[in-house]
Regions:
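Membrane-embedded alpha-helical bundles of multi-pass transporters/translocases
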Residues: 1-190
């Protein structure tokens, strides 16, 4: 089997495992919290950072690859690694600023995404989102690292990146339902 075929099979297997765990994550949430304010608040809080950063992260990754290749071709491996470090640092700083802004304006952001939420569900969604939006820096770092790995022709590890995240979410759901639902977003940041 050729190297490309092995990479394709590995990527398909990684994606399949990630999708199965994603399904398991949804089953765990439904089993633990059912159709409740906790599950609604958690789903909104998970989606807000994803929606905010997916477009930005995908754009960063798409722009990073050709720029890295250009720097690598013109100036060599050392310069391309320095370029990667600079991009990484800039993305982390931008994400930290976005996290701070998001934390300040969480109630307004949640109300845009969770139309109809009131009372305890709205309060929980705001709390969950405020905690989870602090993870934007990690999301930004993961997009740059995925692009870097793709440049280095490592496609399996980026395909596996959702696996530990889904395992962490499932574990957080199980622990939080036994102890306290307020732990749910905090456990995801550990």
């Amino acid at each position: 089997m050729s190297r490309v075929a092995k990479a394709a099979v590995g990527l398909m297997a990684a994606t399949l495992v990630a999708k199965i765990l994603g399904f398991g994550r949804e089953l765990a949430l439904a089993s633990a919290y059912g159709a409740s304010g906790v599950s609604d608040a958690f789903l909104v809080a998970m989606n807000i950072p994803a929606v905010i950063f997916t477009a930005i992260g995908t754009s960063l990754g798409t722009a990073f690859i050709p720029l890295y290749c250009e720097v690598n071709a013109n100036k060599g491996e050392q310069s391309s690694n320095k370029f990667t470090n600079n991009v990484f640092n800039i993305v982390v700083i931008i994400c930290l600023v976005l996290s701070a802004i998001g934390a300040i304006f969480t109630p307004q952001i949640v109300k845009m995404f969770a139309v109809g939420f009131e009372g305890e569900t709205l309060s929980l969604a705001i709390y969950y989102t405020r905690v989870m939006i602090l993870g934007l820096a990690f999301l930004g770092m993961s997009y740059i690292m995925m692009a870097y790995l793709q440049v280095k022709e490592n496609f399996i590890i980026p395909g596996l990146m959702p696996v530990p995240y889904n395992i962490l979410i499932i574990t957080s759901i199980i622990i939080s339902v036994k102890i306290n639902p307020y732990l749910l977003p905090l456990l995801l940041l550990t």
